[in-house]
């Protein structure tokens, strides 16, 4: 039998392994709504409020809290309990003066890191294209697109943003206010593989034509390791450009 329409339910046993979620308490959990992040790199807001922050004992209480509009993601009110909070999103509760950054812990599980109040977030450029009018469109990891107006997209001095770079996006205005290029010597945050959740400096980049580039990194203990470029998220030069 064919599947007709979008799936609306999710069994706990089928939920992504990196969700911090008891598997055998109940049969079903919340399926995040389609949007800025893939399901394995985000958590629905209800689970954030109930299971991670522990601000509610059950789904009903969590929904009431979310529907008040007191929880912000990237500076915007989110009242939909299925809305996904994903990697590098800034979650704020102004009434309680609490701010969190969505990251992965060293086991690869989605977690919240308490941070200082911030007016910007980091986004990774996953693709880019030249659009009508000759301007450049940057496609970022959290689903947003940013238009960079240029007079000539073929000129290197104007086309400064490359795939794999990171940009600093102001919140809630959602405009680019900073740029950190991908390259040797840059500080990276690892988002997948054996070293997920670690910070390390890029030592070498091996370019490959048909496969993902291989990046050699060195962590704070002096240990060198290799991973693929899609797992490398640039966060700064010597220190992260935001509180992490």
Swiss-Prot record:
Q: Where is the S4 RNA-binding domain?
A: 43-106
Q: Does the keyword rRNA-binding apply?
A: yes
PROSITE patterns the record matches: RIBOSOMAL_S4E (PS00528), S4 (PS50889)
Q: Which UniProt keywords apply?
A: Ribonucleoprotein, Ribosomal protein, RNA-binding, rRNA-binding
- A GO cellular-component term linked to this record: cytosolic small ribosomal subunit
The protein's GO terms of the molecular function aspect are:
rRNA binding; structural constituent of ribosome
Q: Name one Pfam family in it.
A: Ribosomal_S4e
Q: Which GO terms describe its biological process?
A: translation
**Family according to the record:** Belongs to the eukaryotic ribosomal protein eS4 family.
What HAMAP family does its record include? Ribosomal_eS4
Q: What is this protein called?
A: Small ribosomal subunit protein eS4
Organism equals Methanococcus maripaludis (strain C6 / ATCC BAA-1332)
């Amino acid at each position: 039998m064919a599947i007709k329409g979008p799936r609306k339910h999710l069994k706990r046993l089928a939920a992504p392994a990196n969700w911090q979620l008891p598997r055998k308490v109940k049969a079903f959990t919340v399926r995040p709504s389609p949007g800025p992040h893939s399901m394995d790199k985000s958590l629905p807001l209800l689970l954030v409020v109930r299971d991670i922050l522990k601000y509610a004992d059950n789904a009903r209480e969590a929904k009431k809290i979310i529907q008040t509009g007191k929880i912000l993601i990237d500076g915007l009110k989110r009242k939909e309990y299925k809305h996904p909070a994903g990697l590098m999103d800034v979650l704020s509760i102004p009434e309680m003066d609490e701010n969190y950054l969505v990251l992965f812990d060293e086991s690869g599980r989605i977690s919240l890191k308490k941070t200082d109040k911030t007016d910007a977030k980091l986004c990774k450029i996953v693709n880019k294209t030249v659009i009508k009018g000759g301007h450049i469109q940057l496609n970022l990891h959290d689903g947003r697109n940013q238009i960079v107006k240029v007079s000539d997209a073929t000129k290197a001095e104007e086309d400064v943003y490359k795939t794999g770079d990171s940009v600093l996006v102001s919140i809630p205005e959602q405009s680019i206010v900073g740029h950190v290029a991908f390259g040797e010597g840059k500080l990276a945050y690892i988002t997948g593989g054996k070293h997920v959740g670690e910070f390390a400096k890029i030592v070498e980049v091996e370019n490959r034509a048909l496969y993902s580039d291989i990046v050699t990194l060195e962590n704070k203990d002096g240990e060198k390791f290799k991973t693929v470029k899609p797992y490398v998220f640039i966060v700064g030069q010597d220190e992260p450009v935001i509180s992490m």
